[in-house]
Amino acid sequence: WELYYTLLLKDLGCSSNAARICELYLTDDLSFKHDFKTVNGSLPKVLKFVIGHTGLGAGLTERFKAIAHIVQHGDEIAQELIQTRCTRGADIARQLRFGNGVAAGIHSLDEHWNGGGRPERLKGEAIPVLSRIALLAQVVDVFNVSDGADAACWEVEDRCGSWFDPAVVSAFRRCAAEPAFWEQLSAPGLEAAVFALEPGRFVVPLDEDYLDEIAIAFGQVVDAKSPYTAGHSARVALYTEGIAAELGLDEQRRRWLRRAALLHDMGKLGVSNAVLDKPGKLDEDEWAAVKRHAQY
């Protein structure tokens, strides 16, 4: 059951480095993260990615300065971004009452079989098996969606023994040989199929206190996206509680309102930090993106 929840929650910490990515790369964090997943870590491809994604909307001088800074401090920057995401994701998983197995699986998601990953440079069997499986699954999904099954299989073989545990690759080969495996991934009922896989023996009573903790945790995920909104959801919940009390609402009603307040900005995760943290006036398209956060 730990693998199931590791896979679903592996990106819990992603919002925590979004603002930093925008600051360093002068770019849209959403497209940056999406495209970076296709980079295999080789220096030529990393450099090509940096040049192709840094400061495209900035002035020439500003762009050159950003690229030079990234090239000079690339290793430190990569370590900072991944360390932040992995640590935050693992912490939130624990806050959601998942055990150390799930938390460790999330924390070590970017470790590579050959020891070249991050954040701890773990190697081989020292990497939690949940992380080894999740990393391969993530790469397969990215390349299958963008370029098809053949491209996904090629990437797995290319990274076997470097990024990926050969034993996990061997298991994937057996799955990939079955046409039904790929057909299910593109089937309209995929979400329902994933929910049906939930391990029945892992049952946690969903009481009122647990619901509160879930709302608090996801409020923190949202607030971590931008330094300008740190603690915002918690403060809105506090204001909501005070107003509801003044209106004479009962405790149960106030509790639900607090949860709604903590989660009111969930859709902000779908808005780029290039928009959220922009120091100047937003243009028409940027305002439209901000307004869509309620829909998200």
Regions flagged by a language model, labelled:
Residues 1-296:
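Histidine- and acidic-residue-rich, metal-dependent catalytic cores
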